[in-house]
């Protein structure tokens, strides 16, 4: 297999779904473009209605949560449900901590540089203390915290929603994925479409809490229901012409979801795009299409991995350009934003990888004082 071919097509050694990894990057780029809107006029903002791009990540996370539960069931774990739930959330949260700590430091530095003249000493202290709530994932609980990085709400909302959903899904099994999850998803999505809060403001407070947290519950439940659909779909054989047709439907469907982010501002349309995204994710995970065959190379998986640092660190460039207020054409500021976001994300990922390797080779040792 040539090196060029290996970038896109592998020998199947990687167990991850390459199409999903590619889509992680695509929807992450959609979020990055959405957040560049502060540089543009209202009419020319890129993907200005793309707030529902985050729902893709929620849906995938819901699917993978049920997949983890199925593995736990087959392993016949003997730990209590509470401990198992905590272990699952720890497995989700701990790998994110280096990223959250680093972006927290970036945020403190940038905000302090640009707003320190307007803060008293006591204000600076309160600013730091309340910002810790964001680092600890408490932002979407309703606690008023100092927001240093606007896009981190997604992680807080996901962990909060998973805390009750995981034990419910583990305890109830198919009753959850086939009945409770889809019912909860459609009712919450219907409620979101009727409430006054907009998707563009996930921190907006509603009668059910932050709208972002409600979105997390809805989309995670939708992802749980997707798992049930995939299970049912995989039980049947399919002919080549049908697989080819579904491959076209898959790619066209995702193109429609992305294109709608630019043109459809009505919340009802956004809700329908969330349903379409869930259907497409089910199609992608089902393996019916041929996409996985030519989306399984090293480049695809590298893009999937890079989506995490890009999502977390790109907001730093948005804040920087907002504060600097450069007297430059919009196109140049946009180029600086994109280039800076890529550079900061790549550099931060390199720093985190270096620290992980360093601490692996030089683990911290706690000295037992009783032996001294």
Predicted segments, located by residue:
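Membrane-cytosol interface segments of multi-pass membrane proteins
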Residues: 1-195, 301, 306-309, 324-372
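Structural signal for the C-terminal ends of transmembrane alpha-helices
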Residues: 65-74, 112-113, 167-173, 224-235, ...
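Alpha-helical transmembrane segments of multi-pass integral membrane proteins
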Residues: 220, 224, 247-357
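Short juxtamembrane and helix-loop transition motifs at transmembrane-helix boundaries
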Residues: 110-120, 137-147, 200-205, 229-241, ...
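Signature aromatic-anchored transmembrane alpha helix within multi-pass, membrane-resident enzymes
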Residues: 180-187, 239-257
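Residue-level recognition of alpha-helix termini/interfacial anchor residues
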Residues: 176, 216, 229, 238-241, ...
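Localized chelating/binding microdomains
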Residues: 129, 133, 217, 221-224
């Amino acid at each position: 297999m040539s090196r060029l071919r290996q970038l896109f097509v592998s020998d199947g050694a990687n167990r991850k779904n390459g199409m999903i990894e590619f889509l992680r990057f695509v929807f992450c780029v959609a979020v990055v473009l959405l957040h560049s809107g502060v540089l543009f006029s209202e009419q020319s903002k890129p993907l200005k209605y793309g707030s529902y791009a985050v729902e893709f990540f929620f849906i995938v996370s819901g699917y993978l949560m049920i997949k983890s539960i199925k593995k736990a069931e087959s392993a016949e774990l003997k730990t209590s449900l509470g401990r198992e739930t905590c272990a699952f959330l720890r497995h989700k949260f701990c790998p994110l901590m280096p990223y959250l700590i680093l972006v927290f430091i970036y945020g403190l530095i940038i905000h302090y540089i640009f707003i320190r003249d307007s803060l008293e000493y006591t204000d600076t202290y309160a600013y730091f203390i309340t910002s810790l709530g964001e680092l600890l994932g408490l932002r979407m609980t309703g606690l008023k915290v100092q927001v240093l990085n606007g896009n981190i709400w997604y992680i807080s909302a996901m962990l909060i929603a998973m805390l009750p959903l995981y034990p419910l899904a583990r305890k109830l099994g198919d009753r959850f994925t086939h009945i409770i999850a889809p019912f909860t998803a459609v009712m919450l999505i219907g409620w979101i479409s009727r409430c006054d809060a907009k998707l563009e403001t996930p921190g907006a407070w509603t009668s059910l809490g932050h709208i972002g947290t409600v979105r997390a519950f809805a989309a995670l439940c939708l992802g749980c229901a997707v798992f049930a659909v995939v299970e049912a779909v995989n039980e049947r054989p399919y002919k080549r012409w049908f697989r080819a047709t579904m491959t076209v439907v898959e790619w066209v469907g995702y193109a429609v979801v992305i294109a709608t982010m630019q043109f459809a501002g009505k919340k009802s349309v956004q809700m329908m795009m969330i349903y379409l995204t869930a259907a497409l994710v089910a199609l992608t995970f089902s393996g019916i299409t041929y996409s996985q065959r030519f989306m399984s190379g090293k480049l695809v998986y590298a893009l999937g991995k890079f989506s995490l640092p890009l999502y977390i660190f790109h907001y730093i460039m948005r804040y920087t350009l907002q504060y600097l207020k450069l007297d430059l054409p919009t196109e140049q500021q946009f180029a600086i934003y994109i280039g800076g976001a890529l550079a900061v994300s790549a550099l931060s990922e390199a720093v985190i990888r270096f620290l992980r390797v360093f601490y692996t080779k030089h683990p911290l040792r706690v000295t037992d004082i009783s032996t001294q």
